Amino acid sequence: MGQNFSKKSSNDLVNRIIFTLFMLIICRFGSFIPIPGIDSIALNSVAEKNQFGILGMFNMLSGGSLGRMSIFALAIMPYITASIIIQLMSVAYKPLENLKKEGETGKRKINQLSRYLTVLLASFQAYGVALSLESMVTNTGPVVILAGFFFRVTTVITLVVGTILLMWLGEQITQRGIGNGTSLIIFIGIISGVPSAIISMFELSRKGALSPLIAITVCIGVVLLIAIIIFFEKAQRKLLVQYPKRQVGNKIYGGEATHMPLKLNTSGVIPPIFASSILLFPTTLASFSNSNSDTMSMLTYYLGHGKPVYILLYVVLIMFFSFFYTAIVFNSEETANNLRKYGAYIPGKRPGKNTSDYFDYILTRLTVIGGIYLSVICVIPELLMNKYVISLSLGGTSFLIVVNVVLDTMTQIQTYLFSSKYEGLMKKIKLKN
């Protein structure tokens, strides 16, 4: 009987993995279906021109869908943006904060609000994409074959439906598959661009534009970078939490100690994404405008990839968003109050404000190290891309996303296997009894 249960659990895991792969194949298939009314030749020339702007970054996150202007051109980004906005508002807006405390019911309502906001943001972004496409003219002609009201309406509907479909696929993966669906959709998009980036690098090496030694060094550097990311993402500070003893009749319960882990990089991959978006926005606007003014030229030059001003601002913004997002993700006061509610305490710290201040003290130091780590991981590839013209798909943000998603998915698979074995063991014990 126990063997049958173990086999059933194993089959369930395999089915979940197959379901996840099937959903991701649908995502990749949709990224090659273009929206109607686009001249693909003219679009390719525009995509090549803007591959190092904000369009290049979002094209990387969408797995090339934006460059091909497919039905998934907006990718899952409107949903992520909506989720972050709702998360930010839940800190400042009291009704949303109260909704968070309602448990599973409140979580469902917040998810529903995120979906509504996703549709709204996707509609605005889709309309902006339609207007931008209509304004693009290349040597081969305009990007849009027949501009006008009908093109805008069909583009908005197509892109919004594409985003909703991706959002639904992500939710299905989370519920019925393995891993976080949204993260896996971004992951598969980034991974899809890696083979072409590797081929491009070795092609440059073959033609003599890039030294073979440098190409090998870059490959070794990538392996080291992945190892460093894994080390820092797994790094955590464990705080001792003590529970008081209590006597019930003649028996004494409690008194055990446990640990509260605080991640070194609490903010995750959000700071580099936000910092990149803000810095690349002015240069993208400059590339869209037809103005050849000195101001625009100077802006494009100083905020270009690998330039000292760009690197400095990039590091400053990463550090700022590291602190900002950590403060949102981890509420020191709320955590301290929860510990006090359950009678737990940090040894040597009084429950309440003293514990909250201690959390802030520890988190500040962790966030400084985490911010420096994120800055180094993101800046080194920027310098390499600027010097050796390596594809944006091998940027620091890409590495962070890919490694984090792989680690999270592996952890979930291990947890699933462990829980299956535990359930099988409990079932055997019950049968013996």
Curated annotation (Swiss-Prot):
Pfam families (UniProt xref): SecY (PF00344)
HAMAP family xrefs: SecY
UniProt keyword annotations, A-Z: Cell inner membrane, Cell membrane, Membrane, Protein transport, Translocation, Transmembrane, Transmembrane helix, Transport
Compartments, record wording: Cell inner membrane
Name listed for the protein in its UniProt record: Protein translocase subunit SecY
Main location as per UniProt: membrane
Cross-referenced Gene3D superfamilies: SecY subunit domain
GO aspect biological process, one term: protein targeting
UniProt topology in membrane: Multi-pass membrane protein
GO cellular component, one term: plasma membrane
Family: Belongs to the SecY/SEC61-alpha family.
Transmembrane segments annotated in the record for this chain: 17-37, 71-91, 117-137, 149-169, 184-204, 212-232, 268-288, 310-330, 366-386, 388-408
Free-text function comment from the UniProt entry: The central subunit of the protein translocation channel SecYEG. Consists of two halves formed by TMs 1-5 and 6-10. These two domains form a lateral gate at the front which open onto the bilayer between TMs 2 and 7, and are clamped together by SecE at the back. The channel is closed by both a pore ring composed of hydrophobic SecY resides and a short helix (helix 2A) on the extracellular side of the membrane which forms a plug. The plug probably moves laterally to allow the channel to open. The ring and the pore may move independently.
Source domain of life: Bacteria
Subunit structure, as described in the record: Component of the Sec protein translocase complex. Heterotrimer consisting of SecY, SecE and SecG subunits. The heterotrimers can form oligomers, although 1 heterotrimer is thought to be able to translocate proteins. Interacts with the ribosome. Interacts with SecDF, and other proteins may be involved. Interacts with SecA.
